[in-house]
């Protein structure tokens, strides 16, 4: 059976790999000249099941106003005359209740934990390397009020048997000795001991090579113009390089998925939320992070990737343009110098932005559509790297008509098409 995967980011490449392992004849098309060159290119580098959380939560509407007014805040909203944006914002606000947050977080932790296990199995199977480390994530709190507010998250971690440690200042320094120089800057932390880190782009490149060795055909520099439907199914995909026809089709185009699906009458609540990162060469090894430190005040992740430090964060809602805004870099620089002063050479940093495909409730959208042969694997938000292997395994099992190893019903598009469509039931 022939399958066409649209998108060669970490989601598309991972899906293609597992499809090929399952015996499908796979083609992947992407507009870029190689794999993982958009959202997967320079993300924060975390594989963080324990930190998987929806952005929509109790108190977020109030915090959002504060963040927008703070020039170093983690949220920027650039108003657009775009009904899709405002529908997405309204849906997100409706998910900002304690009960919805708990439900959505449990769904996200479930797929993320499964994905981490799939990644480990893949690593053992083919020996793939990507500057990976398995030394946990430290969520660092500068204020006591932040530390006091983690009770609900901790209960969900217990529910899913996710190992964690609540640490005082000394415990944080034991986990990340580089913090010793700034020990008065924070009060404590939550350490997620099973979380990992790694270079998502390097992983995507190397898995693409493994998939190609299994017979996957990667077609680059090919822009999709339209998806053509006939008789309740996809009949083909029209591109600037010609028409592609397959038996099954997988949508893995991240933030751009809705633009191609909308003409088919398939409306998915995925909207781009731009993130920024800097990648900094290490100049002082002892002063550098060992793994990932999440600066809870700025919502910034500081991650060790080999001989580099990746600092990623901020959320900019408003358009599909990856343009760099220098004032966003100031926040990233500030977080790094606050917590790991002198660790990296900021004068040699590279600055990047990418579009995260966010759903308003948090979990991704994986599953069938009203077109019989069109499948979705999109909307992973900030957690595409964390969820990639598990999401791909779920999608491939569904395409094989095999029951996935986890309950994936709550990840389907149907959660937006019920009586609670505005919530993501």
Swiss-Prot record:
<dbReference type="InterPro" id="IPR006076">
    <property type="entry name" value="FAD-dep_OxRdtase"/>
</dbReference>
<dbReference type="GO" id="GO:0008718">
    <property type="term" value="F:D-amino-acid dehydrogenase activity"/>
</dbReference>
<comment type="function">
    <text>Oxidative deamination of D-amino acids.</text>
</comment>
<dbReference type="GO" id="GO:0005886">
    <property type="term" value="C:plasma membrane"/>
</dbReference>
<dbReference type="InterPro" id="IPR036188">
    <property type="entry name" value="FAD/NAD-bd_sf"/>
</dbReference>
<dbReference type="InterPro" id="IPR023080">
    <property type="entry name" value="DadA"/>
</dbReference>
<keyword id="KW-0560">Oxidoreductase</keyword>
<feature type="binding site">
    <location>
        <begin position="3"/>
        <end position="17"/>
    </location>
    <ligand>
        <name>FAD</name>
    </ligand>
</feature>
<keyword id="KW-0285">Flavoprotein</keyword>
<protein>
    <recommendedName>
        <fullName>D-amino acid dehydrogenase</fullName>
        <ecNumber>1.4.99.-</ecNumber>
    </recommendedName>
</protein>
<comment type="similarity">
    <text>Belongs to the DadA oxidoreductase family.</text>
</comment>
<dbReference type="GO" id="GO:0055130">
    <property type="term" value="P:D-alanine catabolic process"/>
</dbReference>
<dbReference type="GO" id="GO:0005737">
    <property type="term" value="C:cytoplasm"/>
</dbReference>
<comment type="pathway">
    <text>Amino-acid degradation; D-alanine degradation; NH(3) and pyruvate from D-alanine: step 1/1.</text>
</comment>
<keyword id="KW-0274">FAD</keyword>
<dbReference type="Pfam" id="PF01266">
    <property type="entry name" value="DAO"/>
</dbReference>
